[in-house]
Amino acid sequence: MQKSCEENEGKPQNMPKAEEDRPLEDVPQEAEGNPQPSEEGVSQEAEGNPRGGPNQPGQGFKEDTPVRHLDPEEMIRGVDELERLREEIRRVRNKFVMMHWKQRHSRSRPYPVCFRP
């Protein structure tokens, strides 16, 4: 039976039940896939950090590694080593380029070259 207009007045028709009115079975269980809200009430996935680690990418790394101060001499040695490695890479690259060029432009081809007059 429908209620009269006076009884329905002021009450929304599709109002969800309050939490205390619901039976215990309807309350969702917090388990497997439900993200836990953080202290501010915003889920960690909404923050953009699904793993729940430190918010700043380098924050945990800074705590784990000791602070290392380099001497100017040690920095110069590192730069010298990088320059040496770059020169070695340059030499090897040039070597392979020359080998490739020689193979493509050699006169002893496995097949005869026909020139048209």
Curated annotation (Swiss-Prot):
Q: Which residues form a coiled coil?
A: 73-100
Per the record, its GO cellular-component terms are: nucleus
Region of interest: Disordered: 1-75
Pfam families of this UniProt entry?
BEX (PF04538)
Q: What is its main location?
A: nucleus
Statement: the UniProt record of this protein carries the keyword Ribonucleoprotein:
no
Q: Does the keyword Cell membrane apply?
A: no
Q: Indicate where this protein resides in the cell.
A: Nucleus
Q: Basic and acidic residues bias located where?
A: 1-10, 61-75
What are the UniProt keywords, alphabetically? Coiled coil, Nucleus, Transcription, Transcription regulation
Give the matching InterPro entries: TF_A-like/BEX
The similarity annotation says: Belongs to the TFS-II family. TFA subfamily.
Give the protein's biological function. May be involved in transcriptional regulation.
Protein name listed in UniProt: Transcription elongation factor A protein-like 8
The scientific name of the source species is: Homo sapiens
Gene name, per UniProt, is TCEAL8
